[in-house]
Amino acid sequence: MAEQVTEATASGVFCSRILNMVNTGDVNAIILAQRHMLDRFEKTNEMLLNFNGLSNVRLQQMSDRFAHHTRTLVEMKKDLDIIFRRIRMLKGKLAKQYPESFNNVHESPILEDDDDFDPTLKSAATTIATSEQSTESCDTSPSIISPAMSQDFEDLSQAPSDTPSVNGQILTDEELVHED
């Protein structure tokens, strides 16, 4: 039993010496620095949570707007597809009903800006494709054959025409009545 008391005393002495080696001022400074860092991290965490909340709200708003605009664009594309399909059908019907007149029609080039208009382009006008060519394509843009690319191209804008026209455009019956 005496040995146990001396062992406890030896271990107690050892522990007390180790504790005396540690500077309590340094330990308190470390604890104070850790509390200060903890406060800063908590504030930063709160700011990040607020930022994430605002970002999520803004993301939801932008996602809704993006979805709305995407739906609008898809609807517009469908509408344009329907319009161009109807145009191709009408061109096909006109080509079958009036093949000679349809082949004589010249379409002026589409100009992006009126300032770029050059009247010399009329002589190199493009012709509208036949109904077989326009219905084969799934393209939503009108089919146009370039005069330079077509070997069978005949420049009809210089030849006298049986149908009345103004600036290369064939006049309708109503326009003829108004012009007389």
UniProtKB/Swiss-Prot annotation:
Keywords: Lysosome, Membrane
Pfam families linked: KxDL (PF10241)
GO CC annotation, single: lysosomal membrane
InterPro entries: KXD1-like, KxDL_dom
Region of interest: Disordered: 130-180
Subcellular location: Lysosome membrane
Domain of life: Eukaryota
GO biological processes: lysosome localization; vesicle-mediated transport
Extent of Polar residues compositional bias: 130-144, 158-170
Assembly mode: Associates with the BLOC-1 complex.
Protein family according to the UniProt entry: Belongs to the KXD1 family.
Task performed by this protein: As part of a BORC-like complex may play a role in lysosomes movement and localization at the cell periphery. Associated with the cytosolic face of lysosomes, this complex may couple lysosomes to microtubule plus-end-directed kinesin motor. May also be involved in the biogenesis of lysosome-related organelles such as melanosomes.
Designated name of the protein: KxDL motif-containing protein 1
Source species of the chain: Xenopus laevis
